[in-house]
Structure formats: C-alpha cells, structure tokens
C-alpha cells in the first residue's frame, strides 16, 4: 500500500499544469548537474570522457556525444554498477523466461529493437521503471490532478490494452513485464500480440473493455479497420477514453480517422528504449510534449548544431536525466524531428514536438490466398534483436514474395548467417508466412544512404518498380 500511495504522490508532483517554464528549466538543470557528477564519479567511461571539464558550469554543448556503437563497445565501463556485464546481460536476454526477473535482483533489462541499427542493451532500477508509468498517467492522460481520483484507482483500476509484437525484452513489452508489483492494484493490463489472429484480439479487447489502448500505428490502424467494418464493436461499449500511438509515426489524417471511428482521443508518444519518458502525448491535440524536467532533447543538424523550432533536424541528441545506472548523455538517434515554433494550445509549459519523420518506412506485403497482406517490419526485425555483432541492417522487397536482408557486422566481427537464417525462418514460420516468402541474406560492409543522407532500413523496390512501369504505360496527355 505504501508503494501505491508514494506513486500517487508522484503523480501529483508530475502534473504539468502546476509547472512553469522556469521551474521546468530549473529542475532540468538540477538533475543535469547531479547526473554529470554521478557519471564522472561512478562510470569509468564518463570519468575519461568528462575529464578536464568543470561539471558545475559546463554547457551541454561542451560535452561529447555518444553513439549506440560507442555505448555498446564500452558497455562494461559505461554503467555505474561494476557487477553489470554486457556478456551476462546478453545471455540473460537470450532466455525469454528471464523476462520480468530482475537482473542481479535489482534491475529491469531491455534491448532496443534495432530499428535504428544495432540493438542496445538497457538496464534501469525499479524507481526508473515506476517513473515510466507515473509520467504517462500524470502527463499523457486527462486524469484530474486532485488526490482522491488517483486514490480511487486502488478500487477502480485503469484498464489498459497494450498491443505489441511477441513477448520479449524490447522496451514496450519489458516495461510492463517489470511493472512494480505495488502498481498491480492500480492498473489492469491486457497484453496483445500483433501476430495473433485479429479475431482473437478483437474478442479479448471487447471482453476486457479497456479505458486505454496503446500500440504501434500499424496495429491501431488495423483495429480501426475492424471497427469501421463492423467486425469489432468497441465504441458501443462506451469504455474507451484514449488511444496512444507509440514507436511509429501516425499521420494527422490517420489519427483523425481513428478518433472518428472510436470516439476517443488519439495521442502520440515519441520515446525510445534508452529514454522511455522522453515525451508524453498531448492531451488535447497532435504531437507530444518533451518531459524536459526528466530528459533533454536536442534537435540538431548533421554537425550537432541546434536547429530552430519549426525546422526539421537531421538527428537528435538525447540525455536521460533519471537513469543513473546507465548514464545516457547526448545520445545520437537517427530521427528527424521538428519542434513547434509556438506554444501548444493545450497550455502545457513543456516543449511541443510537432513532427517526427525519421522512422517512416515503406510497407512490405505479399499476396496470400489472393488477398494482399501487409508483412510487418517486425517479422524480419525480431530475429535480429539479439544479434549484438550487427551494426546495421536493411530489409528490401524485390518481388511479390522476394525479400533481401542486408546485414553489416560491427567492424572486426563476423556474423553467423546460418544462425540468423534459422532464427528468421523460425519467426516467419510462426507467422504462417513460410510458404509465401523467399528470403535472401547478404552480408555487406555498408548500406548505401538514401536521399536524406540516412540509411533507409525498409525499402519496397518491387512496388516502386511497379509504380514506375505503370507511369510509363500511361499515354502522354492521359487524364488531362
């Protein structure tokens, strides 16, 4: 009970409309200085990197940046608990039965999906894990700020349906697997897999009667189509209050359509495994708000120079202000983000993210029994989760059933292609796609950059070729 009451008190403190821009900046500065001091004292990696800097006065731009490759290469020296070892964590995450079990009896463990290249291992303590839920409920839902409504969750818990890929150590699933036990009375969670039959998921959702649904844009749009076509009847149950999109961009058009279908507000969250509370979805409109008292988001150009609000950056630098176990400072992420130039109309003092373009991918598809079926990116991505010697990858559709998986090993490492092939085909078989796809594996030293100067990790060259052929076959002047 004490843990739940402490959590409710945290919700009150995090309520954004009690804050001002000045108090947010002051709290950010306080936590930033504390993080630097802790990292320099307890992390051999940061002790070297921050040597010679006055950590009480240096500016953010004085600090070195951190890439995923650098973090993974120096992992044992970067973490602040010397008992944490990269090799042990890798073995720990390879055993799915460890999901939800605290590493060293203290830490939650996850690995990033690898959608941004090489997977990264993440450890965080139980306070950080609880903060994920506190921030999202205090800032990304229309819960009232009064104490009693929060206390009422002990009697009438929030009902959350979460649609992810298969169970695993990727961040969204791990967050719920490591949810502190004292939160159990406040949150009833229905976990759904995007790979399960849609009719099964529909029945589970309707029986559960969720207040909130969270999922990838592609999964939410699939649910919307089921509701629109009458195969799901969630709206008439009058239970759904909010839909939250995570991990994939959701267009305004799609968001508005989902709102009209379900009669519930649709919000976006922009986050990553390295900083799960980076933003919270706006409770009134589109986009999300940076939790600037808990994280720093720098939108920069290719030379790490800040770009003004309203201008799309080439990448972002993320500083996590709450994870002292694995300090993540000015961490490079290959996302093209645009911050709002004007304050958000909702009145929040937190900075508003207007647009995220870096994770847009081509759609992959096959024809199955005469019906076109989308093949989600995760079908290829999940088997690559634990390939820690993988630096980069690209999935390319080259024909109606032909796919190429291009793999770049970390410099000085070799990839076990036969092992990767077995993992990939096992996943394809479990998805019921084995007789519908042909997969070729290519190991290469580099993947050509796209027009934006970034790696395009999912390409559908087949549909691009078909579109070009169609255009070429249209007579000149047709349609004018």
Regions inferred by a protein language model and the residue ranges of each:
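Nucleotide 5′-phosphate-binding alpha/beta core
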Residues: 1-111, 118-142, 148-150, 155-157, ...
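AMP-binding/adenylate-forming
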Residues: 127-130, 136, 159-221
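Adenylate-forming
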Residues: 193-200, 210-253, 267-273
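Short hydrophobic/charged patches on amphipathic alpha-helices used for structural packing
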Residues: 199-202, 206, 232, 381-384
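AMP-binding/adenylate-forming catalytic core of the ANL superfamily
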Residues: 213, 317, 322-432
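Conserved AMP-binding/adenylate-forming
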Residues: 245-343
